[in-house]
């Protein structure tokens, strides 16, 4: 596992929650002796939905809602088996989606 890289992608709607999770992942990886690159903030996806307030007429009266998806990228360089076990057993708060990918 010396030349491998673990690429961790985090997604969440709350930017504070994703930053706390990234910090926890970095601390865990550094405790096991691996080198860490990141967190790299990726572009935020903004989804806007417009709905009519009234049912029949009053088309000028509309309401907009938005949902922002924040993303972070963390690379763990030269991980050991101990690092992989620690990262897979790490508990994250609800609302944070984690994708672990092992690359050569």
From Swiss-Prot:
Alphabetized GO MF terms: structural constituent of ribosome; tRNA binding
Enumerate the InterPro entries for this protein: Ribosomal_uS10, Ribosomal_uS10_CS, Ribosomal_uS10_dom, Ribosomal_uS10_dom_sf
Q: Does the keyword Iron apply?
A: no
Taxonomy, superkingdom = Bacteria
Task: Summarize the subunit comment.
Answer: Part of the 30S ribosomal subunit.
What exactly does this protein do? Involved in the binding of tRNA to the ribosomes.
**NCBIfam families according to UniProt:** PRK00596.1, rpsJ_bact
Name used for this protein in its record: Small ribosomal subunit protein uS10
